[in-house]
Structures are given as structure tokens and as C-alpha cells.
UniProtKB/Swiss-Prot annotation:
<dbReference type="GO" id="GO:0019843">
    <property type="term" value="F:rRNA binding"/>
</dbReference>
<dbReference type="InterPro" id="IPR001892">
    <property type="entry name" value="Ribosomal_uS13"/>
</dbReference>
<comment type="function">
    <text>Located at the top of the head of the 30S subunit, it contacts several helices of the 16S rRNA. In the 70S ribosome it contacts the 23S rRNA (bridge B1a) and protein L5 of the 50S subunit (bridge B1b), connecting the 2 subunits; these bridges are implicated in subunit movement. Contacts the tRNAs in the A and P-sites.</text>
</comment>
<keyword id="KW-0687">Ribonucleoprotein</keyword>
<keyword id="KW-0820">tRNA-binding</keyword>
<feature type="compositionally biased region" description="Basic residues">
    <location>
        <begin position="105"/>
        <end position="123"/>
    </location>
</feature>
<dbReference type="GO" id="GO:0003735">
    <property type="term" value="F:structural constituent of ribosome"/>
</dbReference>
<dbReference type="Pfam" id="PF00416">
    <property type="entry name" value="Ribosomal_S13"/>
</dbReference>
<protein>
    <recommendedName>
        <fullName>Small ribosomal subunit protein uS13</fullName>
    </recommendedName>
</protein>
<dbReference type="InterPro" id="IPR010979">
    <property type="entry name" value="Ribosomal_uS13-like_H2TH"/>
</dbReference>
<dbReference type="GO" id="GO:0005829">
    <property type="term" value="C:cytosol"/>
</dbReference>
<keyword id="KW-0694">RNA-binding</keyword>
<dbReference type="GO" id="GO:0006412">
    <property type="term" value="P:translation"/>
</dbReference>
<feature type="region of interest" description="Disordered">
    <location>
        <begin position="103"/>
        <end position="123"/>
    </location>
</feature>
<dbReference type="GO" id="GO:0000049">
    <property type="term" value="F:tRNA binding"/>
</dbReference>
<dbReference type="GO" id="GO:0015935">
    <property type="term" value="C:small ribosomal subunit"/>
</dbReference>
<keyword id="KW-0689">Ribosomal protein</keyword>
């Protein structure tokens, strides 16, 4: 099993797909990576040589911000937005959608499960 940036890549998947298990590497950056190190994207992870794995590992370490470093940067960016009191920071703080989606009916992913509000009737 190939281990790159602290992530065990699944042996039975194609390299192009397996690289996306690393936080910060998607399909397009995986394709670029494989092109740079001259590895066929159709190759299975179990068929990679040690040399190919080390070339991939070196390139990712040198040129890509992945896993812990990227997660830290994202959380610091969100913290900064909250501290400066921007609109985006306010939305993050309240747990609402940040990019302008409607919230009257949808936005359940950000808001969490429905909280039923009781109705008060006159006596």
C-alpha cells in the first residue's frame, strides 16, 4: 500500500482516482501530477514501482499544500474572516450559507436538522 502525505492510497484503484484520497488533490490536479512525473493514469496503485511512488511523494511535498497544512490554512482563513467582522465571517459564525444561497426554506446542511417552533394561541 502506497503512503503519500500521511494517507494510505487504496491498492485496487487507478492512481488517478487514488490520489484524490489526499485532502487538497482533486481529479484535475491528480492528472497534472501524473503528467509531470510521467506515470500512466490507468495504472493501479499496486502496480506502481517504488521509484514512481517516491517521485510522486517528492512532487507533492514540494509543490502542493495538502492535508494538515491546507486544513490549517483554511481554518485560519475562516478565523480571520470572523475576527475582522466581515459579512462572510458573520455567516460562518452563525452557521449559515456563506455564498448567498436562500435560507428561508433550504440550507439544511449548514443549519442542521429542523427545530420545530411551537405556535402560541390566544386563550
Amino acid at each position: 500500500m502506497a503512503r503519500i502525505s500521511g494517507v494510505d492510497l487504496p491498492r485496487d484503484k487507478r492512481v488517478e482516482v487514488a490520489l484524490t484520497y489526499i485532502y487538497g488533490i482533486g481529479r484535475s490536479s491528480a492528472k497534472q501530477l501524473l503528467e509531470q512525473v510521467n506515470v500512466n493514469p490507468e495504472t493501479r496503485v499496486r502496480d506502481l514501482t517504488e521509484e514512481e511512488i517516491s517521485r510522486l511523494r517528492d512532487l507533492i511535498d514540494k509543490e502542493y499544500k495538502v492535508e494538515g497544512d491546507l486544513r490549517r490554512e483554511v481554518s485560519l482563513n475562516i478565523k480571520r474572516l470572523i475576527e475582522i467582522g466581515s459579512y462572510r465571517g458573520l455567516r460562518h459564525r452563525r452557521g449559515l450559507p456563506v455564498w448567498g444561497q436562500r435560507t428561508r426554506t433550504n440550507a439544511r446542511t449548514r443549519k442542521g436538522p429542523k427545530k420545530t417552533v411551537g405556535v402560541r394561541r390566544k386563550k
